[in-house]
Amino acid sequence: MTRTLPPCLLAFVAGSLLALPASQSLASGYHFGSQSVSAQGTAHANGAEAADPSTIFYNPAGLARLPGTQVTGGMSILLPRGDYEDGGSTDVFGNPVEGDAGSYLPDAAAAPNFYFSRQLNDNVTVGLGIFVPFGAKLDYKEDWSGRYGIQSASLETVNFNPSIAYRFNEHHSIGFGVSAQYIRSIQRGAADVKGASRQLAGQFVDENYDQTRLAATVPGLVELIYGVPVPEQITDCQGVADRDGFVDCVASNFADNVEGDGYFRAKGDDWGFGWNIGYLWEPTENTRFGISYRSNIRHTLEGKTKWSFADVGGRVPSPDVDLGDGLLPDRDAIHQIFDPDNWINPGDFAAARLHPNSNGKTAIDTPEMLSISAFHQLNRKVALMADVTWTRHSRLDEVRIGIDQVDGYPYFNGVTEGDLAVQQDWKDTYKISLGMNYQYSDDLLLRTGVAYDKSPVSSTQLRHPAFPDADRYWLSFGANYKLTPDTSVDLAYSFVQFDSGKMEYTDNCSPAGWVPGSGGLYEDSGVRCTGNGGTYKGEYKTHIHFFGLALNHSF
């Protein structure tokens, strides 16, 4: 029988890893929850078992225990359910934002993995792993209450991990691997054009307060002078005495003409490189302990940011009108503001003066992991195992998409696009797994395991709809069945229950593209940003049914 792997098989596996993104990460943060079906059956407690080539991910030193040439290829299939109940989300002005999220996770998702090992001699074994280390897939309804934060997101990765292990003697082995990791991210969200229109109108009225107040106070005289009636959006605010209230009244009235949202889509990809190392100590034939470390990988994703305002309706006065400094403005300028025939579609203005399609980039540091594991063959039938994994999620303090400026684009009032930033301040986490094997017969091995996986989200105020993570609990079952002396199949099932995740995240930006100043939403502080402002408030309830199937063969 040939020992050569067909190139088409490797190409298929690599392509599948990108074509089938995972749902919301099954491990804490955005780690995908399983890189091996045999490991899934024990809730990933088997880091020191080294039962097949998937030990490349968990502890590469385990390769030294694998005789001959071995191949394992698996598929993880997820059936998630994620429900969101809104608890009073508001836009930047404090108005309720309504809309059903539906199930924010896809109906199903899948991710394959592939591992190969080859024993070169009594001391050296080499291998290759291709797997999904990170993944996320969120898919809210377009009109849900948190749409100004995000509507959909996809994070896809594939990791190529060639490894080598050296066995010093029957007690000590080490392993080392390098990783080439490809990552691709796509996210989509809504743009609050109505909010932006209200801000720009309010800024205009505030800067031209005397003229606007005069028009509201003596509309008949203004019409007599300029030959055009004062819009009711201004005259309806005649009775509002204080300046701030008057400005807000006029701005709100004009913004009520606006219907529909704009949309943005950000896409980027990158290659990054890292390494992993492991040590395996076998004090007796039936007992072994392992320690392994997987490095962080730094990615700088570069891609495109695109905007669409085709769904925006309504007409408002253009904010790009200069009334001059006098109490009696220019006649043409007044007609631009007062005559509805001269009003513009706010979506067209947003595309032409606020949001060009542009390049962008974001930096992502995947977290390093440190694992300590143990395995003990209690008797001929029963084996016990445990694993504790620490993950440095604190590397993620924020997600920031830097948006490049477009040369020659006529940014309104010089308000260029700022970064789109999501504050996270994640904390380091740990996962504790306990598992057991039971040799039911010569051909059938049964597995089970439980795990507690801590979430990196540090508070309700820092839980964002793009990262609705929470603590989770694993209950897993698995089996390995020998079809022939050289071929076996692995099966696994896990039920993953998430704690309820309450959210009350506030976006400090505003739809007009600036951080509001001390004077309120109509004052430009000079600090640029991309966002919509508002508060996303609600609660997530999530569980996942997780199935695994793998085929193993020894040559």
Q: What do the predicted segments below correspond to?
A:
Residues 3, 90-98, 530-534:
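Low-complexity, polar-biased intrinsically disordered regions enriched in Pro/Ser/Thr/Gly
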Residues 15-16, 51, 360:
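Short N-terminal alpha-helical targeting/association segments
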Residues 8-21:
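Bacterial N-terminal signal peptides
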Residues 21-126, 130-132, 164, 494:
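N-terminal, post-signal peptide beta-strand-biased segments of exported outer-membrane/organellar beta-barrel
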Residues 26-40, 108-555:
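Outer-membrane beta-barrel porins/channels
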Residues 1-7:
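Positively charged n-region of N-terminal signal peptides that target proteins for export
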